[in-house]
UniProtKB/Swiss-Prot annotation:
Entries under SUPFAM superfamilies matching the protein: EF-G C-terminal domain-like, P-loop containing nucleoside triphosphate hydrolases, Translation proteins
Family, as annotated: Belongs to the TRAFAC class translation factor GTPase superfamily. Classic translation factor GTPase family. LepA subfamily.
Protein name, as recorded: Elongation factor 4
Native organism taxonomy: Bacteria, Bacillati, Actinomycetota, Actinomycetes, Mycobacteriales
Organism, scientific name: Mycobacterium leprae (strain TN)
Location(s) in or outside the cell: Cell membrane
Amino acid sequence: MSWSLRVDKPDTGESPFKHSLVTGAQEIPISSFADKTFTAPAQIRNFCIIAHIDHGKSTLADRMLQLTGVVDERSMRAQYLDRMDIERERGITIKAQNVRLSWSVTAGGTTENYVLHLIDTPGHVDFTYEVSRALEACEGAVLLVDAVQGIEAQTLANLYLALERDLTIIPVLNKIDLPAADPDRYAAEIAHIIGYESGDVLRVSGKTGEGVSDLLDEVVRRVPHPQGDPDAPTRAMIFDSVYDIYRGVVTYVRVVDGKISPRERIAMMSTGATYELLEVGIVSPEPKASAGLGVGEVGYLITGVKDVRQSKVGDTVTTVRYGATEPLTGYREPKPMVYSGLYPVDSSDYPSLRDALGKLQLNDAALTYEPETSVALGVGYRCGFLGLLHIDITRERLEREFDLDLISTSPNVVYRVVTEDNTEIVVTNPSDWPEGKIRTVYEPVVKITIIAPSEFIGTIMELCQSRRGELGGMDYLSPERVELRYIMPLGEIIFDFFDSLKSRTRGYASLDYEEAGEQEAQLVKVDILLQGEAVDAFSAIVHKDSASAYGNKMTNKLKELIPRQQFEVPVQAAIGSKVIARENIRAIRKDVLSKCYGGDITRKRKLLEKQKEGKKRMKTIGRVEVPQEAFVAALSADAAGDKDKK
């Protein structure tokens, strides 16, 4: 077991590098085999765990940390590798983590020491790119499946990513200690999908630790050791980078060829930028500085850079002297799929929102933002995200970590509009929609995979067809479970598709999607008019067939939310100049006759005529003030899938 003297750290999700800076509080580890770097590649095994949300991946990682002795009982806490509070609360992993473990295997009377690099990956569909680059750093993958729920759509998507990279798959059933577990049924299902025998599927319990040591033995036995040339020019792949307030950007790499040593000058091959290496180290599971990294090893680099975007995930690191000329394959820029406006409820918070987004972007290279102004909501930012969970988590982090009150507008996808004069416009916001004649509109489409009990096939097909989905194929994984594949517009699934799917299948269906290009579509922009004036925050781009339903829904909602005025206010939904829905907010009638106790009828008539004239004048010059609460209620109930209904 590795002991270390250090300041004991409270569970706050704070920087793991903080204490390594304070003199006297520096870690003094009593070394284990894994603390020495430049291990022979034959003694290294790099593997990751692929699992759906809530299938016990982080709990299994906890047991591995305890079994291999890198975390003592005193320091142990649940979900040790999930450092953010939000990761623990939601039970999801957002940032991939890695840890270096030592493990001994006794065979034929001799004991061999091995170094295992465990790379913990996110399970959610929005973070597929995070998963794909974590897989690049491995030779093997543990396919972890809940023995109560069986294999889910996102696990299947990540499994295919692993198979594309020729990773060795070790199938494992978790949670076998639960009374509702059905390991035999799901072992047969997994074996059917990946072409193994059901006897090859290991059975473990992350909670009790049963079967975990056998799993580590299997990792050593089945996963191939890393291949690479120690004498070739240095090439290392970045699979993650995080911003640390004490040390700047910490870049996690896997060395493919050559070696990395401290105080060398390194270069990023995608940008050509060069930096001096201040520190090279390993994570076990707290960071420890080392003498360098050799072939197949996983560790971190610190260069003192302050912006994560200069250390791009998937990029190749090489040395300036005798550097490599060919980068490793597979690098791509993460690009936003969904856009949404974020506005502070109190406009004086705008500078705080700008600073907060800047800090979040240090840790999240996929987040993009640019200033925008809305007549209704004031100044804010148009932000680009990977998907709905990404929006949700970013907004929650802004509200929690930076204490901001925000309104987010309905999410939008990126449309490509070609006008009559062949001008091409990229639209990420309804206010960018061109006026005048439009020749064609292209919208992004996705391939979606749904896995659900076979009894729900009818209701799922009905839902997908109502969202303009085209059936691509259907397979039975077992007599009870079916996989459906559809091509569907991304704009149709970013609202409330996932919630509708869950409610129609009693929560049993799981969903995964991936980009599949674009298609022509008959889309229109629906404006909501109050008193004849368009309110930009309520505009939306919808399909022609569902425009009138959207118009009716919004006009009804606003009729309830906007307070009555002294004059009648029409609430209209319009496509261009054509009104497609209308509701009236009735006027408040002030009783002008209350002071007349009797007397002549002409006196009363005169007062009523005067009131009528005043209302007429008010109607021509009066402006309708929409209260902030009405915006919040209309947008939050409309956007992101009616989350309040959950």
